[in-house]
């Protein structure tokens, strides 16, 4: 969400940014919101003048009423002024109603206008234009056939998709035995990994109010992703970054408290509307999963430094699990409206012989802070908006796919990397049961 003053003073820049994001249908919104803003400011000015006039006229009436004790003709003059005050009061009520209507319309439009992207963002309409930046680790190409990930899990009696389908429908799963333990081990390792980086571990609310969601994501994304609790102003979270950032809603943070660095575990719930291909079946794209997430609230001048640190930590974590990865810079058309800059970390799939997304790191500038009314009080006493960032530490369903494929041996066993062994009871290898 942009600052109205910034938009008013830079309409062409805002329009050019909309074009870069291939959202030309939003171009008329810029002129529309500027016109509404002008009308609103005119109404505010007139209302302010009427309030000042009311105060002056009220004093005048008081003087005339006092003078009327000696000069009754002053009563008639006072009554005329009272009539003017009444007319002004009626007009003031109209203006206050207009202001409310204008502000609601302005707010609604401002939520639709995308944030200004960073100059370094590549321009393109969709994720096909995302740019590979760097690879980390040599992609593995084994000399044996790697089964589909659910087949690997089934060889350990580790997954039951059929039972989950009967109980909950498509997009759910039961994890069992060593696979369930591996799932929890990855989460525990990721938690400790981030604590070692200086982050505060957090278990946040798993349901949040609608106004918090409006503050952290676009309405379109919200409608496509979120499950609403019927009859309640509550939504199941699609990612814990939303409830972690929401922790600071309406707060004034002392500058000395920055940066705020939180890492959280949570279940996540997503509608995942739309049809997907065979490679998005199994546990790749599902309605319920667990995730370790990180967020940072920081000074504006520090946000790009944090951005680079955060995605590099994702690379470090995956490499410690013997998973080759690459960094992809997201193009303009692939950025959600609140994002200034974003990159995906993709893991290597030896079975598909290609990379697939496992993490997403984003700098949202001051967009979330503006929507959520999060402010910082500087050492000089001045208020400003902080920047917010988020990054997936690990989402085990997709992580498990990458982990199993990259650590699978020809005999069907799976090697456990050294860093994960303490979380697996000292096991160095998982042996299939089938």
Language-model regions, residue ranges each:
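N-terminal alpha-helical targeting/anchoring segments
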Residues: 1-140, 154, 158
